[in-house]
UniProtKB/Swiss-Prot annotation:
Its EC number is 2.7.7.6. The gene is rpoB. GO terms for cellular component: DNA-directed RNA polymerase complex. The keyword Transcription applies. The keyword Magnesium does not apply. The lineage of its organism: Bacteria, Bacillati, Bacillota, Bacilli, Lactobacillales. It catalyses: RNA(n) + a ribonucleoside 5'-triphosphate = RNA(n+1) + diphosphate. One of its GO terms (biological process) is DNA-templated transcription. This is DNA-directed RNA polymerase subunit beta. Residues 581-603, 1172-1197 are annotated as: Disordered. Pfam families: RNA_pol_Rpb2_1, RNA_pol_Rpb2_2, RNA_pol_Rpb2_3, RNA_pol_Rpb2_45, RNA_pol_Rpb2_6, RNA_pol_Rpb2_7. DNA-dependent RNA polymerase catalyzes the transcription of DNA into RNA using the four ribonucleoside triphosphates as substrates.
């Protein structure tokens, strides 16, 4: 096949091996977030206020209505919000109108509704100065669902559930005896007839008239549902029975029963299907979707009485086309069911019916009852829906209709930011509504204004809580641009109203055929969240109902040619069509080359004649998400390893001088640009000025546009976010062109790693078990060097004893420790600091209050005031040393917003330059990960015949069992490309074939097996076998040894157990667990074990004594009782068990609380002794009292 060159942008051209024609641009990748938020701002807010308002008081005198809303200008810009650690938000003002119905007076007023968080251009929010993302949630769609099960006897039983957005669930099923039952809101079962009767159809004959008289499960229910109380009507009795189930034990009347049932289902405030639920219910129950494939038991006539489709016709697509327009007519086959006035709703119930033959018994005539023409604006359920739903349920027993697959994407929908926000806001408004009603009745109706009625606290609190602590509002993953982009496209089945990890079974997590082109089957976390957290496919988009759609090219039904007309289909619509693969061979005119093609229909992959094809995929990468689409030769990798590859690309650390992959897939440019980290030209123009901080562009209309660049900014993950210009002065630029690369980018393309020369061979056992051997050159030339920035904060607060002070005057600190602090005690920018160095000098008062007798005594003894401040300076934590990159100072005088009680805050940023070292984790794009085990001098590395040493050695054992062959193909093609000096684009499922790789190797003058003779760098001799050598894109991951290495000698202890804390963050110890104890027991190392379990852990008295005896050079004393043992005794005593501890002689051991201060004389005792033995405290020259050198003996105390 012929390759062709593709110009990615002005700087990069790649040789493409793709054969499929690109008919559709990849849509904007952050659209999931931005479109949803825009909808919320344009329509969602209005909808919500209109739902809640008008609010009327209990007497109906006052009415508060919503008029309009407006958003003001944000108080802080995006940059300022980050620096000041505040929300990027704008004030929301709502215009409300208050009408006094008695006087006719109208007051309009603008009411402030708090600050509303704004979304940034690329789909994130800035909350408290940190970027956050609201992840879209994948939930079960409201609607009506039918399921099929087999009971113990092997009989097939059907069930129905009506699931609303909010409100009571309604379930239908048949029991072991075949009786049709109903349940409301998970209460006890009732015969199905009770609900039908409650609608106002009391007699058995009325029920059979509606549904037909040959339905076994209904007839059994009628038999079971006997008339118990002849003094009551059947309707009244049914209403009371239902009331009894819903409110057991409460006194019941017909009226209260009727209003309860009406409120449960037919009150829009209590029951809400949402526009999605209404759409799903109408779609499921309308006759249009149910007639296909059935046989008519009556003639279908048009309005003129002509037969359009005769009786006994089996309805196919053609006859459906004839019937379809008739079904849309208001009065076509409509039955008006007139209920008794005792029923819940007295209005006539309109349903649409057609008679057909049963599929089980072709002679039996059954009814299809549709729910009529219910408007989409009606969001609660109606009796017509329930009757049509019951009819569908009965028809299933006749083989008519289909059950639903709950994991099908036609039944699961996405709640994006806009909807999640709307739901939260609505909760706030509902709480506010209660307050407004109460205030309306309390306040004077003549003088009251909208402002006095409204309390915005509940609304503000709810929004704040959502962004701050909801499970779906997450701290943005800012390791690299791909991680950011991916986080915004993530779909989660967890969260409020979703699943929980423990309850989610295998089916929910599994890949479903309806995921094709909608949800990536590969990218998902390993571990407990597998399958629950997924990613939106590249071309997927979310429609107005929240269902994921994917685009297809339409195939003309007459000519069978593929057109460029694109249709977006949801999963349930797609099930009706046959869809050909994107790489089906086509002629230039769009006709298929072969008479048959491989296609999909529902969950079947079929070889089908081209006449049956309805659509064709738009692109081979339609199936996958962005990070999976960045893996070249994905089709040659095992899916488990591809999963790791997709996940690890998000963890690649931005390097100092990254390089885009030599073998790419073509998505690198779009991923980088859409991540929002590159600087993009907003208009066409000419570059006039460039330096590291700004780019100035003269636009065509003569204005000078200045683009500030991001410099050494700390990202959420502590990585260095930096932008580098890639344009020159005088260069002409187009709108949308990349002016400056962001982190992990090169020439506008994603560049997560480097392209080293890699060989698959062993080296003295150093690459055993996925270990990696590195050439020292990679360290020396900063190939894998990255910059990391950590932020440290110190606040000077007001304490009870006086204000804290940031100062250079710190007690007991030598001048050498203060050398880099300025006059105010803050470190200078550019200073090099190590662990434990002072960053901000701070002192806290110990209290200069009225002195107590004891303190006066001590002052008398020591002769001077004890220093009243202690050193609380901010110091560099362990492993945190580096260069001071920036210092930010916030004070009230400068007008900065500080928390209450804080007078000054200092933020210090420390930058570390980390070269690659032993223990760092590295990985390719195919899940081929490993840790660096040794860094070898360049001269000792194996070298090629031209003398060039290999950069990285990987173990050949890592390939066969893992089945990620993509890395080998990438290796060979990369080698050829490097020799030819070109870059390559090989898209997923449409890349270079084996033959094309061999051709490229030949073109580059290399052997076609891609192997080379290598020479041992230590001896200079050739190795026995030729070795695979090539170029592969290899990344350094965020799991660096510097962040993980940790050691402790003395550190903090847990308060209750007195054992050392655990973990690096707490500066904890290493846990010596149960199994480790066994190991020492096995060797009989009794003393080692004893000191580990006592002195080194929680024997409080023992560890203090050990310290003392080491200092004094005495023998180490015997250990005491571990604190955890004392805790156990106390816990048993708390259970009321009298527990005593006896020693070997049978005497009780006193378990008194042994504090560290047990043997330190108290101040009271000192005063006492001073009175009794004043000579003890006399110094050499009588006027300087001193404390004796030895501790006071016990009896003195």
């Amino acid at each position: 096949m012929v390759t062709h060159n593709v110009k990615i942008n002005k700087h990069v051209t790649r040789r493409s091996y793709s054969s499929a024609k690109e008919v559709l641009e990849i849509p904007p990748l952050t659209e999931v977030q931005t479109a949803s938020y825009k909808w919320f701002m344009d329509k969602g807010i209005k909808e919500m206020f209109n739902d809640i308002m008008p609010i009327e008081d209990f007497a109906g005198k006052l009415s508060l209505e919503y008029v309009d809303y407006s958003l003001g200008e944000p108080k802080y810009s995006l940059k300022e919000s980050r620096e000041q650690a505040v929300n990027y938000a704008a004030p929301l003002h709502v215009t409300l109108r208050l009408t006094n119905k008695e006087t006719g007076e109208i007051k309009s007023q603008d009411v402030y509704f708090g600050e509303f968080p704004l979304m940034t251009e690329y789909g994130s929010f800035v909350i408290n100065g940190a970027e956050r993302v609201v992840v879209s949630q994948l939930v079960r769609s409201p609607g009506i669902y039918y399921n099929e099960d087999t009971d113990k006897t092997g009989r097939v039983v059907y069930g129905t559930t009506v699931i609303p957005n909010r409100g009571a669930w309604l379930e239908l099923d048949t029991d072991a005896k075949g009786v049709a039952n109903i349940r409301i809101d998970r209460t006890r079962k009732l015969p199905i007839t009770e609900l039908i009767r409650s609608f106002g159809f009391g007699s058995d004959s009325e029920i059979q008239d509606i549904f037909g008289d040959e339905i076994d499960s209904l007839n059994l229910a009628i038999e079971k549902d006997v008339h118990k109380d002849p003094s009551m009507s059947r309707v009244g009795e049914a209403l009371e029975d239902i009331y009894e189930r819903l409110r057991p034990g409460e006194p019941k009347t017909i009226d209260s029963s009727r209003s309860l049932l009406a409120a449960r289902f037919f009150d829009p405030k209590r029951y809400d299907l949402g526009n999605v639920g209404r759409y799903k219910v109408n779609k499921k129950l309308s006759l249009k979707s149910r007639l296909l494939g059935q046989t008519l038991a009556e003639d279908i006539l048009n309005s003129d009485g002509e037969v359009v489709v005769p009786k006994d016709t089996k309805i196919d697509k053609k006859s459906m086309k004839l019937i379809s327009p008739l079904l849309d007519e208001e009065d076509f086959h409509v039955e008006n069911l007139q209920p008794d006035e005792e029923g819940v709703l007295p209005d006539p119930i309109k349903v649409q019916t057609i008679k057909i033959f049963s599929q089980v018994d072709p002679t039996k005539v059954i009814k299809l009852i549709g729910n009529g023409h219910i408007d989409e604006s009606i969001h609660h359920i109606l009796p017509a829906d329930i009757i049509a739903g019951m009819n569908y349920f009965f028809n299933l027993q006749e083989g008519v209709g289909a059950t639903d697959d709950i994991d099908h994407l036609g039944n699961r929908r996405i709640r994006s930011v806009g909807e999640l926000l709307e739901n939260q806001f609505r909760i706030g408004l509902t709480r506010m509504e209660r307050v407004v009603r109460e205030r309306m009745s309390i306040q004077d109706s003549d003088t009251v204004t909208p402002q006095q009625l409204i309390n915005i606290r509940p609304v503000v609190a709810v929004v704040k809580e959502f962004f701050g602590s909801s499970q779906l509002s997450q701290f943005m993953d800012q390791t690299n641009p791909l991680g950011e982009l991916n986080h915004k496209r993530r779909l989660s089945a967890l969260g409020p109203g979703g699943l929980t990890r423990d309850r989610a079974g295998y089916e929910v997590r599994d890949v479903h055929y309806s995921h094709y082109g909608r949800i990536d089957p590969i990218e998902t976390p390993e571990g407990p969240n597998i399958g629950l957290i997924t990613s939106l496919a590249v071309y997927g988009r979310i429609n107005e109902y929240g269902f994921i759609e994917t685009p297809y090219r339409r195939v003309d039904w007459d000519t069978h040619k593929v057109t460029d007309k694109i249709d977006y289909l949801t999963a349930d619509v797609e099930d009706n069509y046959t869809i050909a693969q994107a790489n089906s061979p086509l002629n230039d005119d769009g006709s298929f080359t072969n008479p048959t093609v491989t296609a999909r229909h529902g969950d079947n992959n079929i070889e089908t004649p081209i006449e049956d094809v309805d659509y064709m995929d738009v692109s081979p990468k339609q199936v996958v998400a962005v990070s999976t689409a960045a893996i070249p030769f994905l089709e040659n990798d095992d899916s488990n390893r591809a999963l790791m590859g997709a996940n690890m690309q998000r963890q690649a650390v931005p390097l100092v001088a990254p390089h885009s992959p030599i073998v790419g897939t073509g998505i690198e440019y779009r991923a980088a640009v859409d991540s929002g980290l590159a600087q993009i030209a907003e208009e066409k123009g000419t570059v006039e000025y460039v330096d590291g901080r700004t780019i100035k562009v003269r636009e065509e209309d003569g204005t000078l546009h200045e683009y500030p660049l991001m410099k050494f900014q700390r990202s959420n993950g502590g990585k260095n976010y930096n932008q580098t210009p890639i344009v020159k002065v005088g260069e002409k630029i187009e709108k949308g062109e990349v002016l400056a690369d962001g982190p992990a980018m090169e020439n506008g393309e994603l560049a997560l790693g480097q392209n080293p020369v890699i060989a698959f061979m062993t080296w003295h056992g150093y690459n055993f078990e996925d270990a990696i051997v590195l050439n020292e050159r990679l360290v020396r030339d900063d190939v894998y060097t990255s910059i990391h920035i950590e932020e440290h904060e110190s606040e000077a607060r007001d304490t009870k004893l006086g204000p804290e002070e940031i100062t250079r005057e710190i007690p007991n600190v030598g001048e050498d420790q203060l050398k880099d602090l300025d006059d105010s005690g803050i470190i200078r920018i550019g200073a090099e600091v190590e662990d434990g160095d002072i960053l901000v000098g701070k002192i806290t008062p110990k209290g200069v209050t009225e002195l107590s007798a004891e303190e006066r005594l001590l002052h008398a003894i020591f002769g001077e005031k004890a220093r009243e401040v202690r050193d609380t300076s901010l110091r560099v934590p362990h492993g945190g040393g580096g260069i001071i990159q920036d210092v930010e100072i916030f004070t009230r005088e400068n007008g900065d917003e500080l928390a209450p009680g804080v007078n000054m805050m200092v933020r210090v940023f420390i930058a570390q330059k980390r070269k690659i070292q032993v223990g760092d984790k590295m990985a390719g794009r195919h899940g081929n990960k490993g840790t660096v085990s040794v860094v070898v001098p360049e001269e000792d590395m194996p070298f090629m015949p031209d003398g060039r040493p290999i950069d990285i050695l990987l173990s050949p054992m890592g390939v066969p069992s893992r089945m990620n062959i993509g890395q080998i193909l990438e290796l060979h093609l990369g080698m050829a490309a490097k020799k030819l000096g070109i870059k390559i684009m090989t898209p997923v499922f449409d890349g270079a074939s084996d033959d094309e790789i061999i051709d490229a190797l030949k073109e580059a003058g290399l052997d076609e097996d891609g192997k080379t003779v290598l020479y041992d760098g230590q001896t200079g001799e050739a190795f026995d076998n030729r070795i695979s050598v090539g170029v592969m894109h290899y990344m350094k991951l965020a799991h660096m040894v510097d962040d993980k290495i940790h050691a402790r000698s003395i550190g903090p202890y847990s308060l209750v157990t007195q054992q050392p804390l655990g973990g690096k963050a707490q500066f904890g110890g290493q846990r010596f667990g149960e199994m480790e104890v066994w190991a020492l027991e096995a060797y009989g190392a009794a003393y080692t074990l004893q000191e580990i379990l006592t002195y080194k852990s929680d024997d409080v008295r023992g560890r203090n004594k050990v310290f003392e005896s080491i200092v004094k050079g005495q023998a180490i004393p015997k250990p005491g009782v571990p604190e955890s043992f004392r805790v156990l005794v106390k816990e048993l005593q708390a259970l009321g068990l009298d527990m005593k501890v006896l020693n070997g002689k049978g005497q009780e051991v006193k378990m008194a609380q042994m504090d560290e201060d047990d043997n330190v004389a108290t101040v009271d005792a000192l005063e006492q002794i001073a009175k009794e033995k004043p000579d003890l405290f006399k110094g050499d020259d009588d006027d300087t009292p001193r404390i004796p050198a030895t501790k006071l003996d016990e009896e003195n105390v």
